[in-house]
Regions:
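Contiguous C-terminal substrate-recognition/catalytic subdomains in enzyme active sites
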Residues: 165-172
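Active-site nucleotide/adenylate-binding loops and adjacent lid/helix of ATP-dependent enzymes
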Residues: 10-165
């Protein structure tokens, strides 16, 4: 892995390096490249690739190069896939991956120094997406700002939820 898995690494390249034991824990995925062809032709090509890989909706779409979930979306329909394709940058690669049935994502930090035959795991963490609970009084923007985790990442969450920031979620 060129940059040791840091920001800007290809998810496809990293996932393809997984050995047989690790692969059984990775949800199936396909990698596609947004091109300059007709949007509907790209959509049909993506649908055919999904069908060939036995993938179906809902499906997770994510940039091949990403950070902190930027550009990651849960797509529930062909229409949502079309919208994702339409807004995705030209010539960029993205993954369509089966949605995992778990609430958390595991992060494993493995280090092998040059010259060593074997490395070691130095950190394991479970990563949960921050969530807020409506109280019937505060807007989504206010709830995000008040959340200890999400409040530190408003630069990520505000752009994702622009259309809903003034919405007041019901209690619970």
């Amino acid at each position: 892995i060129k940059l040791s898995g840091m920001v800007g690494e290809s998810k496809t390249d990293i996932l393809n390096l997984a050995g047989p034991v690790a692969k059984q824990w990775i949800e199936p995925f396909i990698t596609l490249t947004k091109n300059a062809h007709n949007l509907d032709a790209q959509l049909e090509s993506a649908m055919q690739a999904m069908n060939s890989a036995q993938l179906s909706f809902p499906i997770v779409a994510k940039p091949d190069l990403g950070c902190r979930g930027v550009g990651v979306k849960l797509l529930k329909s062909k229409a949502q896939l079309r919208d994702y394709l339409q807004t995705f940058p030209a010539s960029a690669r993205f993954l369509l991956q089966r949605k995992a049935p778990y609430q958390a994502e595991a992060g494993v930090f493995y280090v092998r120094y040059p010259g060593q035959e074997q490395g070691k795991i130095i950190s394991i963490t479970l990563k949960y997406a921050p969530s807020v609970v409506g109280d019937g009084t505060h807007t989504l923007k206010e709830l995000i700002e008040r959340c200890p985790r999400a409040g530190q990442l408003t630069h990520l969450y505000f752009p994702r939820h622009t259309q809903k920031l003034d919405w007041v979620p019901a209690e619970g």
